[in-house]
């Protein structure tokens, strides 16, 4: 079952539809573990395991899916081709969120992200939205900055599931 963003609660037939909340809830017991799929330059899929959660967009307040990433492959894919799919599961139940990535980080400036302190706090917010906890936030902040971590925000264009 799938739907467009303009109708997040019911389908055309009146059947209940999968929402962003439904999708994220599947991974609540597993610290937001999900598979993110991006497009390589040759059009094939690159998939990897991430922690993802839901939070208000820092500029608009709209509910978005968020994750943190770093490294060459996934970021290069998202910079060139921002389309992605994030799939959550619990047992045999699954839900996929599709949309376009909005990147925010030290190498991906956004007009609403004006300084390193805002990025530091946003990285923490995304981590905790995905169910993460940390015993030493100073260490967490240091590693995020050292690895030049980037926040990926996804405004869902489609959410669908097998249930």
PLM features: residue spans?
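Short, basic/aromatic recognition patches
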Residues: 12-35
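Glycine-rich nucleotide phosphate-binding loop and flanking beta-alpha elements
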Residues: 42, 73, 158-160
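Short beta-strand segments
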Residues: 31-70, 78, 84-88, 96-100
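Short acidic (Asp/Glu) patches
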Residues: 69-72, 79-83, 128-139
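Alpha-helix boundary recognition
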Residues: 25-29, 79-80, 145
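Charged, gly/pro-rich active-site loop segments
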Residues: 3-14, 92-163
């Amino acid at each position: 079952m799938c739907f467009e963003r303009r109708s997040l609660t019911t389908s055309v037939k009146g059947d209940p539809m999968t929402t962003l909340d439904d999708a994220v809830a599947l991974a609540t017991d597993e610290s937001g573990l999900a598979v993110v799929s991006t497009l390589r330059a040759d059009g094939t899929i690159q998939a990897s395991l991430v922690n993802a959660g839901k939070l208000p967009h820092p500029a608009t307040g709209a509910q978005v899916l968020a994750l943190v990433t770093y490294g060459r492959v996934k970021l290069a894919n998202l910079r060139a081709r921002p389309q992605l799919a994030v799939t959550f599961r619990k047992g045999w139940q699954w839900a996929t969120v599709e949309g376009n990535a909005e990147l925010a980080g030290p190498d991906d400036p956004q007009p609403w992200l004006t300084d390193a302190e805002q990025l530091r706090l946003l990285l923490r917010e995304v981590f905790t939205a995905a169910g993460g906890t940390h015993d030493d936030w100073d260490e967490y902040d240091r590693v995020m900055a050292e690895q030049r971590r980037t926040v990926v925000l996804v405004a869902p264009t489609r959410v669908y599931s097998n249930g």
